[in-house]
């Protein structure tokens, strides 16, 4: 994953994902409506960098993590929106969660893909950068 180098304008930093997990769920709101919940956790190391500066400093790591979280959030949000608005298809299997978790609701609906297309998305992304995978900082 490539993000901006906060210490050198116009330069990039690549993050090598070393660990990741994702959870998806359907939430039932107080008003009886459903929503999509996706939680993503990832860890990574700084792979390559363009430009100069110490990217592993305590001041810079949070900036990189924030950028990484926003990048992942934007990509996931875009993918879900495509499935909902363009393809109108639940390619993620949220309908199966509804069927298992809310069987009575499932029995009452007729067109899941139509319902899926209108569900709000709640997305939580946590990205941790552990350090540098580079042999040396230059």
Placement of each model-derived feature along the sequence:
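Active-site environment of non-heme Fe oxygenases that use a 2-His-1-carboxylate facial triad
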Residues: 1-138
